[in-house]
């Protein structure tokens, strides 16, 4: 069997190998010989030559099939050719099961559910371990010399030698990892008068190499226009001692109280000392970004925060900064709490209340979709209520960017109760999953419970995530008789298990928006132009005495002290700080307002 680093040919077999939380993608030329095949997998998984491994491939029905003999390997390749699949999906486990038929160490049924775990994907070629990176700086591909930036131009960077190429070019690399590249793989300033399109705008900015040498990550750099006299030029102006005029740090804020906490971050209410403005600060420890957790979702969240900053129904960004141990997002503080807290007080909402909230949510989702963003995490907890009673969506870490009309993605993600059937089936999906989640949320608002409530099941085996997914996929949704015909029909429209028939799911997203606006549940009840201008009076006005009022936040958070734990020097020493280059950001509109105070 030829090495996976050989020249690309149509007959090469793509091996997508999952091992210990990573996906290693490599290529081999048939015929595949069992001993060579196992040696190749051991090398890709960094196991020594005599280490016992168990190898299983996934057939077209999603079932794992062991490969222990040449005959079984040949059968896997034959099935791959018959099915015309693009790749052979393989799982590798260390050791052998104690008895035939028993699972291997680390093997359970969730391992084989498509996308059910977050896998860190690495492409192995010529000794390089390429990983997808958002290279927003103007960096030239080592192979084709074109710039690596923008939609359809995903960058790959070797995690060892930092060589950068387009995804489409990585199999043309002839330089072995560790050799000195002889190419233009450094950030390059554009020629005079020549710009690049960033986010649909002309960018005439220049790029610089890092003072420490090497290739700048560029993953976090902003998309704004840089022109003489622009707000961004002002943001980078300096005072007499050379410090940035608008530099933001933890010293600029007084931490007041914890207002939320999630798996990856906590959110603290804070006062901007100079202006006494109140903000929320989302704090993420850098140490969580290890081999099992990639930084891409933080990059995505920052990018979406920037896009959302001036839209009325989305939480916007004030600034970003970092310390050696943490990342900080300074965002709008929304004092009315979230819909989850509101629902806990009200139990269920009148239809006119649900109509108002869902109308504003529709506009927020359409705004994201029009910018190529799938939200993917709509739930009661992520819908905030401002001081006047309008909603704002927050938490963009689950978003998927760069989705155009007709584009699809396949990552398994979301909050279990809101995950759309197409995700559970392992199908590729688009904006449809957000409209399904809206249907679930509207059901919760008007019925006071989830359409898939499994709490209290007698059989403990039924009270599980897998059983919940089975219900979402198979069980017919029963609409409460207490709801009006209009409400019942719109819930049926959004909760259609077939995304092609689901309300709002048209190839042209504007056609989908019009279908929702013209539905009986909304038609004649909402002036959509006035709604988008926040000129429609909210049905509920939270009693907020001041911007420091925490009445609408759960005491399990607000009773917690906001202090940050002391830094651990040993932990900090293990953090690759270059991964966070360019994370800092200030919103020019916010900062110019503060200058005028």
From Swiss-Prot:
GO MF annotations in UniProt: ATP binding; diacylglycerol-dependent serine/threonine kinase activity; protein domain specific binding; protein serine kinase activity; protein serine/threonine kinase activity; zinc ion binding
Binding-site residues for ATP, renumbered to this chain: 259-267, 282
Stretches assigned to the Protein kinase domain: 253-522
Main localization category: cytoplasm
Domain PB1: 12-95
Function (record text): Required for the normal progression of embryogenesis and viability of the organism. Plays an indispensable role in establishing embryonic polarity and in recruiting and maintaining par-6 to the periphery, through interaction with par-3. Required for epithelial cell polarity in the distal spermatheca. Phosphorylates serine residues of num-1. Required for the expression of antimicrobial peptide nlp-29 in response in response to fungal infection or physical injury.
Protein name: Protein kinase C-like 3
Naturally occurring in which organism (per UniProt): Caenorhabditis briggsae
């Amino acid at each position: 069997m030829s090495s996976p680093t050989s020249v690309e040919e149509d007959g090469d077999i793509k091996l997508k190998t999952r091992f210990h939380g990573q996906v290693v993608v490599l290529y081999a030329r048939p015929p595949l010989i069992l001993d060579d095949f196992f040696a190749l997998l051991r090398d890709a998984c960094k196991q020594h030559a005599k280490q016992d491994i168990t190898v299983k491939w996934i057939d077209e029905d999603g079932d794992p099939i062991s490969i222990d003999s040449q005959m079984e390997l040949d059968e896997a390749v034959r099935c791959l050719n018959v099915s015309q699949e693009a790749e052979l999906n393989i799982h590798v486990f260390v050791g052998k099961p104690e008895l035939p038929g028993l699972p291997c160490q680390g093997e359970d049924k969730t391992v084989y559910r498509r996308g059910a775990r977050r896998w860190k994907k690495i492409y192995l070629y010529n000794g390089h371990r390429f990983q997808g990176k958002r290279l927003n700086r103007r960096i030239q591909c080592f192979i084709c010399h074109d710039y690596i930036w923008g939609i359809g131009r995903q960058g790959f960077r070797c995690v060892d030698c930092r060589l950068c190429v387009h995804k489409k070019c990585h199999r043309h690399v002839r330089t072995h990892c560790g050799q000195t590249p002889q190419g233009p793989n450094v950030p390059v300033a554009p020629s005079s008068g020549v710009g690049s399109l960033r986010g649909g705008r002309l960018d005439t900015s220049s790029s610089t190499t890092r003072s420490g040498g090497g290739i700048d990550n560029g993953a976090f750099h902003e998309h704004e226009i840089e022109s003489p006299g622009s707000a961004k030029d002002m943001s980078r102006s300096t005072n007499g001692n050379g410090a940035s005029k608008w530099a933001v740090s933890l010293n600029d804020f007084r931490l007041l109280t914890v207002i939320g906490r999630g798996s990856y971050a906590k959110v603290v209410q804070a006062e901007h000392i100079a202006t006494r403005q109140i903000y929320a600060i989302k704090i993420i420890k850098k140490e969580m970004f290890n081999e099992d957790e990639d930084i891409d979702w933080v990059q995505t969240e920052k990018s979406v925060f920037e896009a959302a900053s001036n839209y009325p129904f989305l939480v916007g960004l004030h600034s970003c900064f970092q310390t050696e141990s943490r990342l900080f997002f300074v965002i709008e503080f929304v004092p009315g709490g979230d819909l989850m807290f509101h629902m806990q007080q009200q139990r269920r909402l009148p239809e006119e209340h649900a109509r108002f909230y869902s109308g504003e949510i529709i506009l927020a989702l359409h705004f994201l979709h029009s910018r190529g963003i799938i939200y993917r995490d709509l739930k009661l907890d992520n819908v905030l209520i401002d001081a006047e009673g309008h909603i704002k969506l927050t938490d963009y870490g689950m978003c998927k960017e760069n989705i155009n009309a007709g584009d699809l993605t396949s990552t398994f993600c979301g909050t279990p109760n809101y995950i759309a059937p197409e995700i559970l089936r392992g199908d590729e999906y688009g904006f449809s999953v957000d409209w399904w989640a809206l249907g679930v949320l509207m059901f919760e608002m008007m019925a006071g419970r989830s359409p898939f409530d499994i709490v209290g099941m007698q059989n403990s085996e039924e009270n599980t995530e897998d059983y919940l997914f089975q219900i979402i996929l198979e069980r017919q949704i029963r609409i409460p008789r207490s709801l009006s015909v209009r409400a019942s029909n719109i819930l049926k429209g959004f909760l259609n298990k077939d995304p092609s028939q689901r309300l709002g799911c048209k190839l042209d997203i504007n056609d989908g928006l019009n279908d929702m606006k013209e539905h009986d549940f909304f038609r004649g009840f909402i002036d959509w132009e006035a709604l988008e201008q926040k000129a429609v009076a909210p049905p509920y006005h939270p009693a907020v005495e001041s911007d420091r009022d925490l009445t609408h936040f759960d005491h399990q958070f607000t009773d917690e002290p906001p202090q940050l734990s002391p830094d651990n020097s040993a932990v900090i020493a293990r953090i690759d700080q270059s991964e966070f280059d360019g994370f800092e950001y200030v919103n020019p509109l916010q900062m110019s307002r503060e200058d005028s105070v």
